[in-house]
Regions:
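N-terminal nicking endonuclease/strand-transfer module with a His-rich metal-binding environment
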Residues: 1-149
Length: 149
């Protein structure tokens, strides 16, 4: 999301199945739900440019489990309204892949965050999983302090 710590990109299919994998719904099932929500709230079909499903990719240590990432997904849903429905951990390069639904259920529109909100989201993930702060994030001190109080 910010300077290579967490990268969010548009995704148009399911995550690859790995030995450490969790799924609440398939991609096609979630797209049907998203289309229904958008039609219900906005009364028009979703556009092709709508980035309703995005994949979040970030480095994790070998000790991180799928259960910890499921707990993270619940916290992200509660705090940021983004709903994770698939998780995979690739142990060859120790990366976590999480597939998120970025549609606001109240408005039917895609959720977007500005730079400050993106940094806060990234710090939230790093602190939730007790991951080390990358070197290029020294200027994030004030966002780190936000979670202390």
């Amino acid at each position: 999301m910010y300077k290579g710590v967490i990268n969010f990109t548009r995704r148009v299919r399911d995550l690859d199945h790995t030995p450490e994998y969790w799924q609440s719904e398939s991609y096609s099932e979630r797209i049907k739900i998203i289309e229904a929500v958008v039609m219900d709230k906005t009364t028009y079909p979703p556009t092709k440019k709508l980035q309703s499903v995005r994949e979040g990719v970030f480095k994790v240590p070998p000790t991180i489990t799928v259960e910890q990432l499921v707990d993270l997904s619940k916290a992200l849903r509660r705090w940021y309204k983004i709903d994770c429905f698939q998780i995979a951990i690739n142990r060859t390069d120790n990366t976590a892949h999480m597939l998120f639904d970025w549609i606001d259920r109240e408005t039917g529109q895609s959720i977007y965050y500005n730079t400050s909100e993106s940094i806060i989201l990234t710090v939230f993930v790093l602190r939730f999983l007790n991951l080390p702060k990358p070197e290029n994030t020294r200027t994030w001190f004030r966002y780190d302090l936000l979670w202390e109080y």
